[in-house]
Amino acid sequence: MNADAQSTDASLSMREPLSHASIQEMLRRVVEKQAADDTTAIGKVFSEAGRAYAQDALPSDKGEVLKISFSLDATQQNILRANFPGRRTVFSNSSSSSHCFAAAHRLLETDFVYRCFGNTVDSIIDLGGNFVSHMKVKRHNVHCCCPILDARDGARLTERILSLKSYVRKHPEIVGEADYCMDTFQKCSRRADYAFAIHSTSDLDVGELACSLDQKGVMKFICTMMVDADMLIHNEGEIPNFNVRWEIDRKKDLIHFDFIDEPNLGYSHRFSLLKHYLTYNAVDLGHAAYRIERKQDFGGVMVIDLTYSLGFVPKMPHSNGRSCAWYNRVKGQMVVHTVNEGYYHHSYQTAVRRKVLVDKKVLTRVTEVAFRQFRPNADAHSAIQSIATMLSSSTNHTIIGGVTLISGKPLSPDDYIPVATTIYYRVKKLYNAIPEMLSLLDKGERLSTDAVLKGSEGPMWYSGPTFLSALDKVNVPGDFVAKALLSLPKRDLKSLFSRSATSHSERTPVRDESPIRCTDGVFYPIRMLLKCLGSDKFESVTITDPRSNTETTVDLYQSFQKKIETVFSFILGKIDGPSPLISDPVYFQSLEDVYYAEWHQGNAIDASNYARTLLDDIRKQKEESLKAKAKEVEDAQKLNRAILQVHAYLEAHPDGGKIEGLGLSSQFIAKIPELAIPTPKPLPEFEKNAETGEILRINPHSDAILEAIDYLKSTSANSIITLNKLGDHCQWTTKGLDVVWAGDDKRRAFIPKKNTWVGPTARSYPLAKYERAMSKDGYVTLRWDGEVLDANCVRSLSQYEIVFVDQSCVFASAEAIIPSLEKALGLEAHFSVTIVDGVAGCGKTTNIKQIARSSGRDVDLILTSNRSSADELKETIDCSPLTKLHYIRTCDSYLMSASAVKAQRLIFDECFLQHAGLVYAAATLAGCSEVIGFGDTEQIPFVSRNPSFVFRHHKLTGKVERKLITWRSPADATYCLEKYFYKNKKPVKTNSRVLRSIEVVPINSPVSVERNTNALYLCHTQAEKAVLKAQTHLKGCDNIFTTHEAQGKTFDNVYFCRLTRTSTSLATGRDPINGPCNGLVALSRHKKTFKYFTIAHDSDDVIYNACRDAGNTDDSILARSYNHNF
């Protein structure tokens, strides 16, 4: 045993040392083997890198983490998470600002609104948005309107452009540009189904906004703005989380916003425009309407939604409903009428009542306690002090057991004494009315308002006992509230909701807008006029000014209007009964009642006049544009006529010399293409109707040929429309390029000024030598110098910023084939059609070789559906090179030929892969008397590239001859084909003597697919084909095709690969039209072995089920598929 060990060591020592190349090869094999297994260390690295690459390539979605760099404390972060619960956010706290929370909230608002649309492809317009932020998070379908309305907007634009430059410098792989314009939303030329705005519509009238949305075809608009329902009832307030204070100047119709710790960030808006977003529920444009809904309130920032109303007709009701934005704030509020000391002017002696908002629950509780504690002989000062103390404890912070609680709604300390005085007066009046109520109850009489509220009117200001005596003299009818408020202008509601009446200057006299009039000797002429109108003087009151110790006599008058209102109230029965505790028609009013009494307006704003004006302007612009174009055409026609006249003169006088000043050289005409007279094309050789000019449809197969013409035109038109849409989306610039590849990763864009191709990956190359490209002016021709564009071509394209190509630009076959089809319509056709419908591998190619006449006078015309079949036939059929060139070719090549050869017989291979109209047209142009078509009706048929086009005449019809014996497929494959795939051809037999050939190989990834340079690799989709071609271990395997591309091919070994677990109709074979045709082609290409490499274990996979069935079937059963007569 020791001897064996010594010999082994000796042999090892004699081995040559490993070279560097062999070590590299070993490492490569190990990495490739372990990369597919994510449980290994190497597999984990590749898995994480692949996931990161895929996430980076995809647009922003709700599952992606949103990074926020602003410095925020834990409370602010929790508020953001609560406001946006469906968003994964990471707070890095890397940048500091005094308004970090507002900035972070704005970023999340933008993300929230963008995800509401659920669309990352179609164009979306952002009013005043930050195009740099959109580019960073890959919102490439967003166009930003960034108008410069003032210097502040210009500064913001400068900051964004500098930030964009810095970002692009750090990310050189970015090719596209930021998508923005400097026009207002109203003037922007972009159209989209969606639009949104983040804090940028506060100064934009909602009617004007809706008109612009309608003009641009916007169906859904979502905006956010800093707005609070308290703005409807208060003059000032704060938004705590955002650290913002707002104040309304109702005289100037302005609302001011200020960041408390950032004085330079304040801004102002027109309050009347801002208020519309809170109060209106619809916008009526006359011909259209938008519904306004307040969807969400983030505690100071509201999400407002404008949705286009489909099917709207003029005068249709809007069903406005009740606005939820303000109702809860209004419902629990009471308006308390008060009077303050100091509301007296020595020149005018004008008293003013002030209105204070008090919480309804607080007012009820305090009034009830004050009534229980009322003592008729007690001092009024002490009672008012007690009531003021209760108000303070009920509306401010209270500490109970060390815990601070807020009791009720905060009330300004300046309002304690006035509100307490009014409550005391109300309680005293109720107490004094008790005897009279008892006597009236005893008499069974109803109590009238005038009996309860008897007394007289008087001035109201606080001056000790004088104020109480003045309050006691007020006499107002029971329906004063509604009548007085409805008589006020709508703008006066602002003063009704005022909490800051104490800010009035003494130098500015403030009048009470109620029907009470207080005049002195200065207004003697007015007093006399009032007296003539029926107003009586009922009392003169002497008032002492405590500051100047002067006495003034004031005459009080009751207006004629009040008399009439009182009489009508009595006649109509509007006499109030005993009031509840806080329901007083003079001093306590529900804010909800005030709202409906004063704001007597609809909830839908009528913007039809503005819409008509806007539409008229658009119509005038279009008319002017049309007139300008018509004038250009007319001028061009005049110029052309003049040139033709000069040309005719020169032809008529060849020896007369040129006319001075009118000579036109060819170089001059070449510089101006518009002046070039197009050469008329020769008419095709077919008859036309003399009257209508239409082609005479002589061909008996005209229905199929016409359908082929319409189909080719539709595919060409679709290609033009698609490329134009791509250009329009990008505005024919490099903006938003990442969206271009979303629908088709084979699209490419060429930037002439940079001489660069752009695609879905960082380094994208053209997939073919494109014949043409789409520019903003239409198709342009491309010329190639090897693998790159010719220098002269690039120079001619430099007038365009960008051009686009797709697969339709490789070769424009449709435009070249259609003239031949139109020509065939006008020609007679006398040929018979015989269809050899055989199973896969029945010897169609061998049969063609046997029957084809390739020499002599009657040479057969042999056409195929694809180039690979034509090349195969050229190698099989023995004939001269000239015959192969003209008589063995593809159908498209023959129809595009300028001089089509004639033949007595047409042989067409794989005839069901081509539209029947093209086959009939080729036979007509060739002057054939017989057509023989070879194909398989149950293999892949003609596939339309226009899903919306409906075919009725695409299948070749004629006499059918069937062949049910295959020479290619082994016995187990034939068994599967007959059982699972062929429905109309039975029984299927084989002349092959191979019994078993099928094997199922489960894999975890494409890396596990076996390498065989002589095998045919098949898959169902182009995506799977691209994955196979990208595998490093399959380099050199050139035979990788889809099942559609492989139809007609034959190989000894076929490797079919399914690389996705998604179940589709291609895998299940349950396509409602084509059935399992793709699986039939896949399983019928091999002669010796068929290996099915699959990631999925899908019980619905028709190939998988067939292969497993064949593997479990006894040999004797499989042998029944042999052709025993062979």
Curated annotation (Swiss-Prot):
SUPFAM superfamilies reported in the protein's UniProt record: P-loop containing nucleoside triphosphate hydrolases
Domain (+)RNA virus helicase C-terminal: 964-1125
MF GO annotations: ATP binding; helicase activity; hydrolase activity; mRNA methyltransferase activity; RNA binding
Domain (+)RNA virus helicase ATP-binding: 806-963
Any Gene Ontology CC annotation: host cell endoplasmic reticulum membrane
One example of a Gene Ontology biological process annotation: RNA processing
Segments forming domain Alphavirus-like MT: 90-278
Region (ATP-dependent helicase): 834-1094
Region ranges (Methyltransferase): 69-406
Residues reported to bind ATP: 838-845
The UniProt record lists the keyword Nucleotide-binding: yes
Topology class, membrane: Peripheral membrane protein
Keyword Cell membrane in annotation: no
UniProt-listed Enzyme Commission number(s): 3.6.4.-, 2.1.1.-
Pfam families the record matches: Viral_helicase1, Vmethyltransf
Main location: host cell
Keywords of the record: ATP-binding, Helicase, Host endoplasmic reticulum, Host membrane, Hydrolase, Membrane, Methyltransferase, Nucleotide-binding, Transferase
Cited PROSITE patterns: ALPHAVIRUS_MT, PSRV_HELICASE
Compartment annotation: Host endoplasmic reticulum membrane
Similarity comment: Belongs to the bromoviridae replication protein 1a family.
Function: Involved in the virus replication. Contains a helicase domain and a methyltransferase domain. The methyltransferase domain is probably involved in viral RNA capping. Involved in the formation of ER membrane spherular invaginations in which RNA replication complexes form.
Subunit structure as annotated in this protein's UniProt entry: Interacts with RNA-directed RNA polymerase 2a.
Protein's name in the database: Replication protein 1a
Source species of the chain: Alfalfa mosaic virus
